[in-house]
Amino acid sequence: MSVFPGSVEAAAIEDSLAAHAATVLAVGASDLGKAGRRLMTAIRDQHLAHAAALRTTDPTDPNTAAPSAQGRTPAASPSTSPSGKKPGFAKAVDQLVAAESRAAVAHRARAMTTKGLACLLWGSLAVSSTQLTAVLRGADLAGDSPDPTAATVAAPRTRAPMPLVPVVQAEQEMVRQLHAIVYGYQLALGRLTGARRDTAAAELRRHRILRDRLTARLLNRKAEVPVADAAYVPSTNPRNATSAAKLIRQMETALVPFCGLWLAASTAPAERTEALDQVGRTLGVARRWGASLPAWPGWKLA
């Protein structure tokens, strides 16, 4: 049975990350608060889900259930130092953060040298580790009442199969989504004040710039440019600051899989880099507005 290129090494990375998270849980029994334990458990489970997927014959197909010749994912066990002694809690957390950062670099390197759904697979794992690094650095692992604006890490969920479309079609879909998002941000801005309004206004400008850049690219390709509808029905009607923030969170979260579609469709290295960065940036914005970090950034969920 064939092995998906790069999956052996990547599965080992994900196993190691799961083991690091298990170590934090093991040595931090008296240090972790309830929220910290939930966070570390979710991180461990996400990495185990990654490793399990990487051990299938085709990790880019969520419907692939058969394991490859690599076998099944082993349970993660706490790591120890060369002397056999477990690290302290703070050191264990630092080791996990460092390992996440290294994993992000390794996965991104694979994404930049592949194309299609393989590029999305590695890009998704890279964004996941990048975002988890940020979450861990900002987390109050010992606190039971964390900052309500801090995002959570979601339990792993099954991916939906991702279609592979021509790059022009992916760019057109991005423009359609950005038209709707610009409209939604304009609604939300009317209910926000102070720093949150400034943040939303900056994101609105960013979306307009991206939409204009993709529009120009489509025109250069002599492709049809989608036009904005006269109005859109928002997923949440922004009646106050709370519902305005919810609308932004929903819009940014919904955009991430379209960025993933664009990443899978990208053909030129520069565009691949741009699309991957957009997956991470959009997810980061959604997270700052309270979204949970999914196990597979850029993929639609089943």
Predicted regions and their residues:
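All-alpha RGS (Regulator of G-protein Signaling) helical domain and cognate RGS-like helical scaffolds
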Residues: M1-A302
